[in-house]
């Protein structure tokens, strides 16, 4: 048995065990008395998957290219007067943002300033306390969530892609998944057993088939090996649609070459200049 075959066998075994543990944990969570045991089972599953996460052939790189965005109006997304608090904790107040066709905006702020919350509100996944988000003519929104909550972990890789690529047949969907290194039986795995890097690639693949004209990207280079990160940076750099980016990665900001910066929590806007680059890694 070659090393590669052995690694594949070990990975399959680990995934089966992890899937069984996660299924059992889901059942136990329904009972309050077993909540701690369920949490421990989920952690065991995570450790199993972490042990085999780096076993893919390193010379394979996901081919990431965003297609031309769908046609849209001059300002496909606009937000006015957004505020958000959690209990007595005020996250941000009175944020205005107009995303014009093809514009590039980077959102900066210290941890806890509400960057992820703002993207979730813009994506329609969380309501603001005050203010409103107004979609413009032809808006087609793509959202990349750093915690991968846009993935349905109960569905397979292929099923997740099919929800994003309703206009594609299964053969074409499988081809695109193959370009993101999901081949053969990989497409039949439940998303819940994927490693962090695999979830990132699947979420990016779903963005690619969406033909979005506005991308909301929350830490899109996390969990990627250097070669795949370079592919993501190139895809961002060549994308013709509008982008709102949250990142700690200076390389991602330089790839975007933003026109504007939005500073949280006060919601002030400025034209981008390199003086802001020092804030990226601190954000």
What residue ranges belong to the model's regions?
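ABC ATP-binding cassette signature C-motif
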Residues: 1-5, 66-283
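Coupling and communication elements adjacent to P-loop NTPase active sites across diverse families
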Residues: 2-94, 98-101, 283
